[in-house]
Amino acid sequence: MPRVKGGTVTRKRRKKVLKLAKGYFGSKHTLYKVANQQVMKSGNYAFRDRRQKKRDFRKLWITRINAAARMNGLSYSRLMHGLKLSGIEVNRKMLADLAVNDLNAFNQLADAAKAQLNK
C-alpha cells in the first residue's frame, strides 16, 4: 500500500492559521507554531469579550443614568423604581441616551418617577 503524505492538507491548514494571524507582531505572524498559539488565545479573548461587552455597556448606561438622576435629586434605584410604578417602560440604553443627549426629556421622566414615589 502506498504511503500517503498529507502535504496539501497540512499546507492549507497552516496557511489558514497564518492568514488569521496577519497583523500580529514579531514571529506571531510568520511562525506557524507561535501563530497557532496566538490565534487560539485570540479566539478565546474574542469569545470572552463578546459576553463582557454586554456587561460593560450595561455598567456604562447605569453610571450615566445615575449621574443624571442625582442631578434631579434621585438615586438610580429610586428613579428606576419610580419609573416602574408609573408604568413607563423604557430600557436602560434609551434612558442613558436621553441623559446624555436630551436632558429635558430625561428630567420629565425623573419628575414622573418622583411624583409616583411621593404618592
UniProtKB/Swiss-Prot annotation:
Protein name, as recorded: Large ribosomal subunit protein bL20
Pfam families: Ribosomal_L20 (PF00453)
Any single Gene Ontology cellular-component annotation: ribosome
Name of the gene encoding the protein in the UniProt record: rplT
Family to which this protein belongs: Belongs to the bacterial ribosomal protein bL20 family.
Annotated keywords: Ribonucleoprotein, Ribosomal protein, RNA-binding, rRNA-binding
CDD domains, per the entry: Ribosomal_L20 (cd07026)
PROSITE patterns: RIBOSOMAL_L20
Species this chain originates from: Bacillus licheniformis (strain ATCC 14580 / DSM 13 / JCM 2505 / CCUG 7422 / NBRC 12200 / NCIMB 9375 / NCTC 10341 / NRRL NRS-1264 / Gibson 46)
GO molecular function annotations of the record: rRNA binding; structural constituent of ribosome
GO biological process: ribosomal large subunit assembly; translation
HAMAP family per record: Ribosomal_bL20
Purpose: Binds directly to 23S ribosomal RNA and is necessary for the in vitro assembly process of the 50S ribosomal subunit. It is not involved in the protein synthesizing functions of that subunit.
